[in-house]
Design a protein with these regions (language model features):
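Post-HExxH zinc-binding segment in Zn-dependent metallohydrolases
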Residues: 88-111
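Catalytic glutamate of the conserved HExxH
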Residues: 71, 75-79, 83
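Catalytic zinc-binding patch centered on the HExxH motif and its immediate surroundings
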Residues: 34-56
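Acidic/histidine-rich, surface-exposed loop or edge segments in extracytoplasmic proteins
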Residues: 1-4
Length: 111
């Protein structure tokens, strides 16, 4: 199940999830909740917290549309990594950063 608690990018978030689940079927195996929140003090655009088969993505609530797309894609890659059991932080970030812009462009070209 995929849920976005904020209204600003609900439709866009669902479109991103559909796009990413086509590439990463593992995303449909777990519950994912996206929570827009003020992450200014944390100096990040988003992060993913895992609890068993439930993943919570906190995403900064004042992102531009493009930054929202890139950040949600990045965090959904982390959810897939959680399902695959990839725990090494360096490998996780290298993979997510190496794919986020390519996948963002693919998503934008589909819209």
């Amino acid at each position: 199940m995929f849920i976005i608690t904020g209204k600003k990018f609900t439709t866009l978030g669902n479109q991103i999830f559909e796009f990413m689940s086509g590439l990463y079927p593992n995303l449909t195996e777990v519950d994912i909740e996206v929570i827009p929140t003020d992450l200014t003090e944390d100096n990040v655009f988003g992060w993913t917290l895992e609890n068993n088969d439930q993943n919570e993505i906190e995403i900064h609530n004042e992102l531009s549309q493009k930054d929202f797309i890139t950040t949600l894609i990045h965090e959904l890659i982390h959810v897939d990594q959680n399902v695959r059991g990839l725990r090494d932080d360096t490998q996780r970030e290298n993979e997510a950063y190496s794919l986020e812009h390519t996948l963002t462009n693919q998503f934008l070209n589909k819209c």
